[in-house]
Every structure is written in C-alpha cells, then in structure tokens.
Amino acid sequence: MPKPVILPESQVERIEQILDELRAKTRASYVFLADISGQLINARGITGATDLVTLAALTASNMAATAEMARQIGESQPFRLMFHEGTKRNIYLSQVGNSFLLAVVFDIEVQIGLVRLFSKRATEELLALADEYEKIVQQTPSMMEAGFDTSLDEALDTLLNPSKKTPGDQIIIR
C-alpha cells in the first residue's frame, strides 16, 4: 500500500476551505481532491453510496489515459480538464499541478459553465499547495511510483469483489 502523504494541519484546513467554497458555489453534490496516484486526500459533500476511494483511483487512471491520448495526438502537455456527462450526474476533472486532481460531481441541472469557472478558481488556489506537495513527493519518489498501481489494483479489487468490502470501509465526510 502506498505511503500516505501527511500534510500540515494548516494545509488540510485550507484544502477543506477551498473544497467547501467550490461545492457551495457550484451546487455540486460533492467534490474531492486526490493525488495523481489515486489516493484520496480530502472530500466534501454528500456522497451517498459512492465509494470515494475507488472513484479517486478511477479518476487518476482516467487522467493518465487522457495524458497518453494527448501525447499520441502530438500535444506537448497532458490535457488538464475533462468532463463526463451522465444522465443524472456529471463529473468535471481538473489537473492541479503535476500531482493533484480535483473532481466535481454535480447533478445535470447545474450549468457546466458555473462548474468550469469556479473549478478554475479553486485550481488556481490549490496550485500553491500542489507546489508544496510536489516538493514532498520529490523527497520520496518511490511513493508515487508504487502508489498508482497499488491504489488502482485495490480499488478495482474492491469494486469487482464486493464481498471483500466491509461496513468499516465507508468514508464519512464532514
């Protein structure tokens, strides 16, 4: 299992504040911040039955796949934004620096322009924290190398083998 990055309390509080503001301004069901390996860092809102650990790992793999798509078509940088439109809910993903991803899950009644505007602002605010995080990661590179595969494997195993999941696996978000 990848080693979790321990963030100072002041950074955790700032992340929570940014996520709370984003959720309120966009009327999102929930928002979360994960590292690029798929480890959930923080989440705010009402997730219902959603397994955020699995969703974080899947969004990270989605970002990795689209980064390769960008490379394949000749882009010099990975795509920074993604939007998935559903019949009930949508997901808007933003890459924050090189190590974070921000996800906004919202009902179809919410205007995408609103989500895009406030996600961009939140991403800009999170960039300073991402820079600090990336310095920590550079000091422990093995965490990022092993983290993505392990997180994705565990998330897919839990998703595909629900009998292994216990009631204690639930994440409670303030």
Residue ranges of predicted features:
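Acidic, low-complexity cytosolic segments
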Residues: 1-30, 37-174
